[in-house]
């Protein structure tokens, strides 16, 4: 699991002439209580956890500065929209404001990507958004898989939909996420491995 997490964002594997896909793995380890599941998990994932911690610390000043830029951008964007609304009510021309708005939208700052590779308790919806916005490669890793299988995302009403989403992410396929209340988006070229341990 840890090895696939390290390489899945770097290369694909060609299994046959027309079969190419990610190196991502889904693994489930079944072990009795006291068989050191957490110890083994920590041993193999320590390097990945150390790397992502180092990256977070190194990128923190940039992330903080970018968050400020995004707040300023949102304030300016909101101000221009309010100005358009106000000028329209008064019957004034808004061409210049629309030009300013278009220019501002072209300059929208994006969050600084920070490697957040190891995840545990994730809803599929949040995982999809994180792969799009934060980092396009991740692994759901847990030595207590009961927390994953027993989560709200695995209730009878949503289990098939959520497992299908995870399967598409593992396969490296393209995934359209449609939303009514939020922005819809497309996930493409993202990578997901799953490494779970559970007691029988």
Enumerate the language-model features and the residues they cover:
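Phosphate-handling catalytic cores of nucleic-acid transaction enzymes
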Residues: 1-200
């Amino acid at each position: 699991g840890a090895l696939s997490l390290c390489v899945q964002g770097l290369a694909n594997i060609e299994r046959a002439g027309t079969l190419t896909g990610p190196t991502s793995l889904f693994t489930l380890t079944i072990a009795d209580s006291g068989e050191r599941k957490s110890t083994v998990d920590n041993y193999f994932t320590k390097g990945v956890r150390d790397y992502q911690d180092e990256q977070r610390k190194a990128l923190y000043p940039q992330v903080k500065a970018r968050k400020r830029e995004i707040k300023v951008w949102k304030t300016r964007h909101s101000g221009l929209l309010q100005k358009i609304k106000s000028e329209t009510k008064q019957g004034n021309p808004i061409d210049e404001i629309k030009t300013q708005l278009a220019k501002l939208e072209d300059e929208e700052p994006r969050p600084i990507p920070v490697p957040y590779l190891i995840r545990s308790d994730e809803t599929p919806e949040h995982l999809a958004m994180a792969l799009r916005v934060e980092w396009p490669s991740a692994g759901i890793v847990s030595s207590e898989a009961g927390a994953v299988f027993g989560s709200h995302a695995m209730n009878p009403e949503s289990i098939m939909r959520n497992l299908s989403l995870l399967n598409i992410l593992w396969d490296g396929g393209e995934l359209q996420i449609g939303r009514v209340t939020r922005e819809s988006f497309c996930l493409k070229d993202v990578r997901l491995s799953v490494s779970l341990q559970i007691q029988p």
